[in-house]
Amino acid sequence: MNNSLDYLAYPVIVSNHRQSTTFRKKLDFGHYVSHKNRIQIAKPTVDTKPPVAHTNHILKLSKLQGEQKKINKIEYENKQLCQKIANAHRGPAKVDCWNEYFSKSLNRETRNRELVRITMENQGILKRLVDRKPHYDRRASEIDWQNSRRYIRNTTRYLLSQNE
């Protein structure tokens, strides 16, 4: 404590040995120290600590693993490209600018199946036409022809030639 202010805080009026200033100073200092200790060990009744942070909420392992896979894939592709570049520099010169484009159709198989089906149907129709036998009677048609020639000969004014 400050000694210059002792005379104001503790006046020198001594009527009793219990009222001596040094004893009173000791008591006040003891109370002060105990009060200071109680303040230091006091705990607040309101919890002012931050909430408990779980690492699995902050640090997403699945995202880290996904990023690591992407990085590994990129590194692998870079390594492959470097090997191709090294092989191109090491080996003989080659022309590799041929752009062979093959038309890719989404329904090529369907069109091929349809074409095969139509071809088979056409071949079947052609076979039926070739195998078909005439159904008219030749003898009856010749008799009919002779009758019509006779009718024409009888009705015409001029004679017909023999080969008509």
From Swiss-Prot:
Coiled-coil region(s): 61-90
Summary of the tissues where the protein is detected: Expressed exclusively in testis.
Pfam families: Hmw_CFAP97
Keyword terms, alphabetized: Coiled coil
UniProt GO BP: sperm axoneme assembly
InterPro entries found in the cross-reference section: CFAP97D1/2, Hmw/CFAP97
Membership in a protein family: Belongs to the CFAP97 family.
Function, in words: Required for male fertility through its role in axonemal doublet stabilization which is essential for sperm motility and fertilization.
UniProt-recorded name of the protein: Sperm axonemal maintenance protein CFAP97D1
